[in-house]
């Protein structure tokens, strides 16, 4: 019986032991200021605990509801380990979307934000509680520091001009006249590099950051 663990049984163990040693030495991830409760939980405890469930956390409830949806075109479950968003990740994502195009000037809708959030969750393991904005009316600033896109309302003239022509689909967000917004404003994403240096949301709403 004592010979069950022979030398041949230990093949590969030194490599596994080294991986285990490195794992225990990995520094804790510091979430970006403004990341939500589930992300804070993940950063502080290494997992999402019963402090954040579908019954008491909107992001968790929303994610569980999305797992049954197939309209976004990719799997909802993440392909990488869950992790809280950091300042650098929010910053890098902002410039990636700016450089690659597509988000700047795009009319905001809840569905479009959901698609972006699900893409981040699926490809990066980032929980969607990073993607929040200050309340309106007017410009909505990102709650998470490092995210450099704000939501800017269009004027009535801009909305009217954008609606001209016969090619606009009736269900396009610009034609919905702010149906997804509490203040019925038509909002567009605008890149603002100064948001990487100045946390406007925290200046305007310090009460949002009491637990950060």
From Swiss-Prot:
Motif interval(s): Dileucine internalization motif: 170-171
Site-annotated residues for Might play a role in AP-1 recruitment to the Nef-MHC-I complex: 20
Region span, SH3-binding: 75-84
A Gene Ontology biological process term: symbiont-mediated suppression of host antigen processing and presentation of peptide antigen via MHC class II
A GO molecular-function descriptor: GTP binding
Short motif (Diacidic): ranges: 180-181
Motif (PxxP): 78-81
Highest taxon above the source species: Viruses
Major localization class: host cell
Region named Mediates dimerization, Nef-PTE1 interaction: 114-130
InterPro entries the record matches: HIV-1_Nef_anchor_sf, HIV-1_Nef_core_sf, HIV_Nef
Induction text: Expressed early in the viral replication cycle.
Record site: Cleavage: 62-63
Lipid attachment locations (N-myristoyl glycine): 2
UniProt GO cellular component terms: extracellular region; host cell Golgi membrane; host cell plasma membrane; membrane; virion component
Membrane topology: Lipid-anchor
Alphabetized Pfam families for the sequence: F-protein (PF00469)
Family: Belongs to the lentivirus primate group Nef protein family.
Subunit structure as annotated in this protein's UniProt entry: Monomer; cytosolic form. Homodimer; membrane bound form. Interacts with Nef associated p21-activated kinase (PAK2); this interaction activates PAK2. Associates with the Nef-MHC-I-AP1 complex; this complex is required for MHC-I internalization. Interacts (via C-terminus) with host PI3-kinase. Interacts with host PACS1; this interaction seems to be weak. Interacts with host PACS2. Interacts with host LCK and MAPK3; these interactions inhibit the kinase activity of the latter. Interacts with host ATP6V1H; this interaction may play a role in CD4 endocytosis.
Job description of the protein: Factor of infectivity and pathogenicity, required for optimal virus replication. Alters numerous pathways of T-lymphocyte function and down-regulates immunity surface molecules in order to evade host defense and increase viral infectivity. Alters the functionality of other immunity cells, like dendritic cells, monocytes/macrophages and NK cells.
Note: HIV-1 lineages are divided in three main groups, M (for Major), O (for Outlier), and N (for New, or Non-M, Non-O). The vast majority of strains found worldwide belong to the group M. Group O seems to be endemic to and largely confined to Cameroon and neighboring countries in West Central Africa, where these viruses represent a small minority of HIV-1 strains. The group N is represented by a limited number of isolates from Cameroonian persons. The group M is further subdivided in 9 clades or subtypes (A to D, F to H, J and K).
Domain text: The N-terminal domain is composed of the N-myristoyl glycine and of a cluster of positively charged amino acids. It is required for inner plasma membrane targeting of Nef and virion incorporation, and thereby for infectivity. This domain is also involved in binding to TP53.
Name under which the protein is recorded: Protein Nef
């Amino acid at each position: 019986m004592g010979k069950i663990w022979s030398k041949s049984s230990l093949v590969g163990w030194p490599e596994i032991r080294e991986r285990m040693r490195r794992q225990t030495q990995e520094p804790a991830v510091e979430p970006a200021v403004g990341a939500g409760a589930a992300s804070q939980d993940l950063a502080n405890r290494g997992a999402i605990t019963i402090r954040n469930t579908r019954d008491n956390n909107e992001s968790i409830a929303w994610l569980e509801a999305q797992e049954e949806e197939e309209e976004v075109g990719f799997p909802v479950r993440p392909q990488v380990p869950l992790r809280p968003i950091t300042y650098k990740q929010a910053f890098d994502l902002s410039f990636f979307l700016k450089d690659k195009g597509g988000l700047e000037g795009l009319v905001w809708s809840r569905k479009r934000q959901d698609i972006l959030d699900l893409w981040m969750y699926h490809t990066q393991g980032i929980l969607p509680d990073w993607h929040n904005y200050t309340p309106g009316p007017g410009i909505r600033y990102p709650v998470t520091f490092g995210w450099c896109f704000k939501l800017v309302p269009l004027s009535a003239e801009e909305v009217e001009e954008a609606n001209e022509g016969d090619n606009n689909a009736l269900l396009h967000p610009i034609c919905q006249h702010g149906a997804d917004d509490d203040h019925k404003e038509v909002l567009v994403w605008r890149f603002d590099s100064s948001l990487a240096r100045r946390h406007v949301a925290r200046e305007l709403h310090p009460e949002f950051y009491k637990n950060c």
